Amino acid sequence: MEELPLSKSYQALCSFVRACTPRMKTVWAEPFSGAPSVFVCNHAGAFGPIDMCVKFPLRDKCHAWVNAQVLDAKQVPAYVRQDYWWKPGSLLAPLCNVTLPYLAAAVLPPILNAAPTIPVYHDARVMTTMRQSLKWLKAGEHLIIFPEQPSGFQSHHDWINTGFLN
């Protein structure tokens, strides 16, 4: 499977993030063999994916699973509202509800579509996710997945969501 080169704007954004945020330290529980691997990571809000895609030492050979809805500007507003990016019932919730989803729709898809991602579908297209993942693994690349169970505003359970594909 041939990978498209990362856009200059995505590379510049990654360089900016690396320069302006704390370094990431990778600590291996077991020595890493270099074989194609699936890295199961903590989402930690937006920081887990940003750290793994921008700072992880193996980032150039990694492909992150991303909810397909955030790759499509038309679907982002509904996804953002459902994912609770602001405290429900707060004084600013009405304003956030009419602004943040559309700002996210303008910003997220161009960035994420430029990144080495694999769309994760939650319908019959889930097989597309699996096929793409297997192709990258067979090509010697790695996967990054974030399978925690969302549990409300600024909160995720720390256990793996065993039904994260459906």
Set out the residue ranges of the language-model regions:
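N-terminal membrane-anchoring alpha-helices
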Residues: 1-25
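Soluble catalytic domains of membrane acyltransferases
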Residues: 16-166
